[in-house]
Amino acid sequence: MGLILHKQSGRGYRALSKIFALPSKKTIMQLLNRIPINPGVNDVIFNNLAEVVSGLDESSKYCAVMFDEMSLDPHIHLNVATKEFEGFETNDDEQRNAVIADHALVFMVRGLVKNWKQPLAYTFCRSSTKSVILVRLLTKIITRCQQAGLKVICTICGNTCIQESH
């Protein structure tokens, strides 16, 4: 509950924390860091999504899968919790390679009838994502959304410039 309040309104959370015993921001961040979220399509996200979707009425299951790519500053980081270096290309969500990434591709699903949204997956790549990789990821994500009980009506792409296959 504290996480939901904190994400909805930081100011509101601070005000309520003066009245109620709510966890600190540090505690919330420590709890979030325990959730195993890695680049690619994550079972944790889709398992939780399926649980939530099972309680929705039929019209609330209509949704759009959205994706967009953004540039990043190339950077390598040691994740102390996993003892792995991060910042490398992971654009074929099954593989990681030694190329330093400078772009992130993010997938999200959003309700069309009811106003809800959920991040689904992300990958890192060098330059823009190649079209063959995007098709593979998009197919996998739409399939997983349908398996979770969602009714994907359309896809929406941001201003992504996709590389053609070489």
Predicted regions and their residues:
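Acidic/histidine-rich, metal-coordinating catalytic segments
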Residues: 142, 151-162
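Electropositive nucleic-acid engagement tracts
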Residues: 8-97, 162
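Electropositive, glycine- and tryptophan-enriched low-complexity nucleic-acid-binding patches
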Residues: 89-151
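Generic beta-sheet signal
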Residues: 62-64, 105, 153
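Short, amphipathic alpha-helical "recognition" segments used to contact nucleic acids or chromatin
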Residues: 1-8
